[in-house]
């Protein structure tokens, strides 16, 4: 394979990688917004739950029953983590990190957007 064919292959690989990473960005942004909203709701509900004077006087489950906003947002947050939201909000960086691991064997790397970085060849003496 001559160097022109290699360059074309590298360009095609780079185009595909940047296309894939950029395709993940809108979904990642939506998942981040969902995580932020649910986290803020949980924090607000927790604050209201903790400052309520009746919280110390009743049982734990009665206290949760009296604060449905906190209970629902907390259950939603836990459900989102079980569904893997913590992986979905960082999906492009996971892909880039895995590509860096593979590309390191070929003296290459890539940035977080998928652009290839060619490293100089090591000199053998």
From Swiss-Prot:
Membrane topology value: Multi-pass membrane protein
Assigned protein family: Belongs to the CNEP1R1 family.
Keywords: Cytoplasm, Lipid metabolism, Membrane, Nucleus, Transmembrane, Transmembrane helix
GO cellular component: cytoplasm; Nem1-Spo7 phosphatase complex; nuclear membrane
Listed GO MF terms: protein phosphatase regulator activity
Chain coiled-coil ranges: none
Reported function: May form with the serine/threonine protein phosphatase ctdnep1 an active complex dephosphorylating and activating lipins. Lipins are phosphatidate phosphatases that catalyze the conversion of phosphatidic acid to diacylglycerol and control the metabolism of fatty acids at different levels. May indirectly modulate the lipid composition of nuclear and/or endoplasmic reticulum membranes and be required for proper nuclear membrane morphology and/or dynamics. May also indirectly regulate the production of lipid droplets and triacylglycerol.
Keyword Transmembrane helix: yes
Subcellular localization(s) per the UniProt record: Nucleus membrane; Cytoplasm
Transmembrane feature ranges: 33-53, 65-85
Record bears the keyword Endoplasmic reticulum: no
Record-linked PANTHER family: NUCLEAR ENVELOPE PHOSPHATASE-REGULATORY SUBUNIT 1
Name of this chain's protein: Nuclear envelope phosphatase-regulatory subunit 1
UniProt GO BP: lipid metabolic process; positive regulation of triglyceride biosynthetic process
């Amino acid at each position: 394979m001559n160097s022109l064919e290699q360059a074309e292959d590298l360009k095609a690989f780079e185009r595909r990688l940047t296309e894939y990473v950029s395709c993940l960005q809108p979904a990642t942004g939506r998942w981040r917004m969902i995580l932020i909203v649910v986290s803020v709701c949980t924090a607000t509900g927790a604050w209201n739950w903790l400052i309520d004077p009746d919280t110390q006087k009743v049982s734990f489950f009665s206290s949760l029953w009296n604060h449905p906003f906190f209970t629902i947002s907390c259950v939603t947050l836990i459900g989102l983590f079980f569904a893997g939201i913590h992986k979905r909000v960082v999906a492009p960086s996971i892909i880039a990190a895995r590509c860096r691991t593979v590309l390191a064997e070929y003296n290459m790397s890539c940035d977080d957007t998928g652009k290839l970085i060619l490293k100089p060849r090591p000199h053998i003496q």
